Structures are given as C-alpha cells and as structure tokens.
C-alpha cells in the first residue's frame, strides 16, 4: 500500500498502509533494532520466500523443519546447516545471511527515504502488540508527517497483534482482553468512513489520530501522535524488584541475577513455535 501511495497516480485518492514494512533491518520482520529475528524469519522463509511461477494456483509453502523444542533445535544449528534445510531457491534467506550489518543492501530496500510529496490521503494502521511490523507503522506515520506535511494524514494505533484490526473476533492477547468490539469499531467507525469520505465525498473528515488506551480500554482522539497532552513520567527500578516514580536515595542499591543461555529462564509454555502471545506470556 505504501508503494502504491508513492506512485503519484492521479486516480489514486486514498491509501491505507496497515502494518507497513518500512525498514527490514531497523525494526520490521527480519530484524528488530538490528537483531536478527531468527525464529520468526526462518519460519517465514519456509512459506513466503519460495520462488514460484505466476499465476499461483496452489499453496507452495514448505513444512517447517523446526523441531519440537525450538530453542534446542536452533542451538544445534550453524548458518550453513540452517540454509541446507531450505531449498536453494530461497534467495532472500541467503541474502539475509550475507548482509548481517546495516549496509547498502538494507538501505536500498528501506522506504524511509521515499516518504515525501505523497498525494493521496493516508490512513496508517498499527498495532501496539504487532510482533512483525510495529516499527513500520509508527515510523511511517512519523516520517510522512515530517517530510510530507501537505499530505492528508491519519493514524490509528490500537492494542492489536499483527493483523488483528481485521479480525472481527479479536478480543486481546493471551489473558489480557480489550473488549469484543475493538476491531469491529475500527472497521465500522474509522476505516469505512475514511474511504467513504475520500472516495465518495460523503460523511465527515476523519479525525487525524485514533489511539486505543489499553489502560481504560477506550478510543481517544487527538491531533497528533504521541499526543501533546501526554503526561510523561519517569519510572525507576528498585532493588526489591518493584517500580517507583521516585528515584532511590541509596546510591549503592543493585539487583543481580544469573543469565545462562544453556539454561534459559522460560517465558513460553510451548517451545515448539512462536505465536503472537509471546509478548505477554511472561506477565
């Protein structure tokens, strides 16, 4: 959707980049803050990176080779053995391994440098619990607002996992529930009116920003995100394992723990795969 918006085609009036990929090294899909999302991208490779002819008439995905204990399975693999477990047609996987640092390969594939002079109205949609492309949504909005100020820009940020905004049954993540109408409200009261206004000229101009406050489970409307009305607080770690809004007066306080990769502290009940609830599973 972002690439379509950049085309400048005169017939294109409104575009909604939803969980848009912005930079594959800084924060979307392949890497998060430069760290390779190994389990995610390796699993993804088995069904998304495979070369195929067009048009596609059947699912060409491959069964995941990851064993029942994913942590142990990856520990016993080298980059070469990981590659050999996949067909040699998976060119993108090989290129990921060939470019472990932020070099020209990743810069050329980044959308950041192109987000300017955007003509159609834009509705960027992102999820606070999107394990794949949270970076892309936040920074696509931020960069369009900065570099393309004439664009009619709108932003929606909800307590969704990846793609949850179009799941009518989405209630929350794990045991944390946000209400049964979170996605239904978005589709009925935000997304549909956006396209109706810009494509048909009907209804009211949409609000610039809709943000779902997970503490109160309510939608909030504001002119920009982050809102100028936010009250920022500094939270301090305390030696008793708690949190405080006041700094400790004990300059010598500390907390210690042992981190042993060979015996990790578990945070997922099921180690055979990665699902969307891993972001809250240790809470």
Each language-model region and where it sits:
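Conserved alpha/beta-hydrolase "acid-adjacent" motif
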Residues: 131-138
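Alpha/beta-hydrolase-fold catalytic nucleophile elbow
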Residues: 16-19, 156-159, 238
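Short beta-strand/loop motif that positions the catalytic acidic residue
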Residues: 118, 124-126
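Accessory cap/linker subdomain of secreted extracellular hydrolases
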Residues: 6-8, 13-117
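Secondary-structure transition/capping motifs at alpha-helix termini
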Residues: 7-13, 132, 143-154, 197-202
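Short helix immediately C-terminal to the catalytic nucleophile in hydrolase catalytic domains
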Residues: 1-5
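Catalytic histidine neighborhood in serine/cysteine hydrolases
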Residues: 145-170
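C-terminal, loop-rich substrate-recognition/catalytic regions characterized by aromatic stacking residues
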Residues: 64-68, 73-78, 165, 172-283
């Amino acid at each position: 959707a972002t690439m379509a918006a950049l085309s400048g085609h005169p017939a294109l009036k409104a575009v909604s980049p939803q969980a848009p990929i912005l930079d594959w090294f800084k924060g979307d899909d392949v890497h998060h803050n430069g760290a390779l999302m190994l389990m995610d991208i390796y699993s993804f490779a088995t069904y998304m990176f495979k070369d195929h002819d067009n048009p596609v008439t059947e699912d060409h995905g491959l069964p995941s080779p990851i064993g029942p204990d994913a942590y142990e399975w990856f520990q016993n693999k080298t980059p070469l053995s990981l590659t050999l477990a996949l067909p040699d047609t998976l060119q993108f996987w090989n290129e990921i391994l060939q470019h472990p640092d932020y070099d020209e390969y990743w810069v050329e594939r980044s959308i950041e440098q192109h987000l300017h002079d955007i003509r159609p109205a834009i509705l960027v949609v992102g999820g606070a619990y999107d394990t794949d492309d949270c970076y892309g949504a936040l920074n696509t909005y931020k960069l369009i607002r900065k570099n393309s100020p004439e664009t009619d820009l709108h932003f929606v940020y909800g307590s969704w996992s990846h793609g949850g905004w179009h799941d009518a049954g989405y209630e929350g993540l794990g045991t944390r529930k946000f209400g049964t109408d979170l996605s239904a409200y978005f589709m009925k009261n935000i997304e549909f009116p956006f396209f109706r206004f810009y494509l048909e000229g009907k209804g009211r101009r949409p609000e610039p920003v809709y943000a779902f406050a997970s503490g109160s489970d309510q939608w909030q409307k504001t002119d920009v995100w982050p809102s100028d009305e936010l009250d920022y607080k500094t939270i301090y770690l305390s030696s008793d394992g708690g949190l405080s809004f006041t700094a400790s007066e004990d300059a010598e306080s500390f907390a210690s723990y042992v981190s042993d990769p060979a015996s990790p502290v578990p945070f997922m009940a099921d180690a055979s795969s990665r699902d969307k609830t891993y972001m809250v599973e240790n809470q």
